[in-house]
Amino acid sequence: MAYRKMLKSKIHRACVTQADLDYEGSITISPELLKVANILPYEAVNVWNITAGTRFETYAITGEKGSTDICVNGAAAHLVTPGDLVIIASFTQILEEDCAAHEPTVVFVDQFNRLKEIRPERIGVKSRIPYPA
């Protein structure tokens, strides 16, 4: 059996609200956003900084319920500045024969990290969010 690493979900254009060098590594995300993006606490995520062009891998931790904070912790805090826009992506392993039917989930948030829209990722479909926002 062959497996492929595929995009599972992403939180698109989240705004970094805090960067904490002194906290152990991770990215803090509200439980509400984690749930709709199907990301578990301690799950590995890639973070792509739209503003600065940096990329890194870390793991998600649960923030406070109802919070809109996105906090990058530990050494990765050097790679972001509060106000930066980021994409937070999670991946999964899928059997090769199931890949054609796979549709990742995209979670869109507004400039305050409040849930705006959830939809499947579709190749060739452009975001309705203009850049720069």
Curated annotation (Swiss-Prot):
InterPro entries assigned to the protein according to its UniProt record, in alphabetical order: Asp_de-COase-like_dom_sf, Asp_decarbox
Subcellular localization(s) per the UniProt record: Cytoplasm
Processing and modification events after translation: Is synthesized initially as an inactive proenzyme, which is activated by self-cleavage at a specific serine bond to produce a beta-subunit with a hydroxyl group at its C-terminus and an alpha-subunit with a pyruvoyl group at its N-terminus.
Pathway assigned to this chain's UniProt record: Cofactor biosynthesis; (R)-pantothenate biosynthesis; beta-alanine from L-aspartate: step 1/1
GO MF assignments: aspartate 1-decarboxylase activity
Record EC number: 4.1.1.11
Catalytic activity, reaction form: L-aspartate + H(+) = beta-alanine + CO2
Cofactor note: Binds 1 pyruvoyl group covalently per subunit.
Active site: 26 (schiff-base intermediate with substrate), 59 (proton donor)
Modified residues (Pyruvic acid (Ser)): 26
GO cellular component: a single term: cytosol
Annotated Pfam families: Asp_decarbox
Residues that coordinate or bind substrate: 58, 74-76
Named cofactor requirement(s): pyruvate
Entry keyword set: Autocatalytic cleavage, Cytoplasm, Decarboxylase, Lyase, Pantothenate biosynthesis, Pyruvate, Schiff base, Zymogen
GO biological process: alanine biosynthetic process; pantothenate biosynthetic process
PANTHER family: ASPARTATE 1-DECARBOXYLASE
Protein function: Catalyzes the pyruvoyl-dependent decarboxylation of aspartate to produce beta-alanine.
Subunit organization: Heterooctamer of four alpha and four beta subunits.
HAMAP family assigned: PanD
Family from the record: Belongs to the PanD family.
Name under which the protein is recorded: Aspartate 1-decarboxylase
Gene name of this polypeptide: panD
